[in-house]
Amino acid sequence: METEKKQESKVRRIVGEVLSQVLNVPILSGALITFFFFKLPSDIPNRLAGFGWALLFLSLIPLCSLFFYIPGKVQEKARVIKRQRIASFVFMIVSYPIGFLVLWLTDAPDIYEAIAVTYTLVTLGLIIVNFLLRYKASGHAAGVAGPVGALIYLFGLIATPLLALIPLTTWARVSA
């Protein structure tokens, strides 16, 4: 019975970790940017360049924070996770506003600029709550709620099933 519980706990932790990575902010922002790229009319100026810049600054650069999950000399899991969490915020708070500036300067489609501003403000809010006020707010949940809210705003009730991603993300973070 005891080993069965341990096995179940291990499976739950693995599933939680996999879902956490799939629902990771840079992955979701990349999916959102790609979705809008294919939804935008093909004759919009700077559509492809805007997509490339948005993907670079809102997805690929922030994704580099995952390299901080590599234990290196520090083997203690809690310290590795804390290091990666801090690196994540640093990558995002630097990359998002620079991305917005590049998108604005290159006259990218407004939707990419709006996404960059939104992620910048959410990240700033999370930094204030997590590091200054010392409450632990979930960046994963915020990173899922933003795109889900945007899609519901744009597409209406048809997009409401995406709301299920928010509790799924919460469960994944608690289980991981």
Predicted regions mapped to residue ranges:
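Loop-to-helix transition at the N-terminal end of transmembrane alpha-helices
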Residues: 45-60, 81-84
